[in-house]
């Protein structure tokens, strides 16, 4: 009898142990203050002339946009993860208009050169991924003061356009 009571007590304690680990909460994790402008973007780089006419598809790449550690609503990071020009710097944003720009900013921590970003926009739901599903899109123009390609190949700056990465293999 003692054996059965011990087994029942052990089973009861184990069941309490499993339910004690079950945390239920109505707490929402939330997001950042600029959540709609942040993301991983699959982009195409275009060579454009001073009038904004596309002269050539230059290359494809990846761009990341993300918030600052202080969760600022006036600036965000833009980073190409070394897929083209190896830049990572802060751009000024207008979150309500979903626009961004930067005037003469060091584009990396080493101070290799300066970048200028103009006409930056995040367009919510305006893009389509490769499967035709709607997604957010990004567009901006950028130039680098240490870039010899524009003079060498006869264009003025780059236009970068793309869509938010869906997380699926495209």
Predicted regions and their residues:
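Positively charged n-region of N-terminal signal peptides that target proteins for export
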Residues: 1-4
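Hydrophobic helical h-region of N-terminal Sec-dependent signal peptides
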Residues: 6-14
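C-terminal motif of bacterial Sec signal peptides marking the signal peptidase cleavage site
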Residues: 16-20
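Bacterial signal peptide processing site
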Residues: 22-25
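First exposed extracellular module after export/assembly in secreted or surface-exposed proteins
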Residues: 28-170
């Amino acid at each position: 009898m003692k054996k059965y009571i011990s087994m029942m007590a052990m089973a009861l304690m184990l069941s309490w142990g499993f339910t004690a680990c079950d945390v239920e909460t109505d707490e929402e994790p939330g997001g950042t203050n600029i959540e709609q402008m942040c993301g991983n973007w699959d982009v195409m780089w275009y060579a454009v002339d001073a009038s904004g006419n596309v002269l050539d598809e230059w290359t494809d790449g990846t761009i990341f946009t993300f918030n600052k550690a202080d969760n600022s609503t006036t600036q965000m990071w833009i980073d190409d993860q070394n897929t083209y020009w190896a830049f990572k710097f802060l751009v000024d944003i207008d979150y309500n208009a979903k626009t961004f720009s930067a005037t003469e900013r060091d584009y990396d921590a080493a101070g290799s050169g300066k970048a200028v970003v103009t006409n930056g926009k995040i367009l919510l739901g305006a893009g389509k991924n490769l499967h035709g599903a709607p997604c957010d899109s990004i567009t901006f123009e950028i130039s680098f003061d240490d870039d010899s390609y524009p003079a060498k190949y006869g264009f003025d700056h780059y236009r970068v356009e793309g869509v938010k990465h869906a997380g699926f293999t495209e």
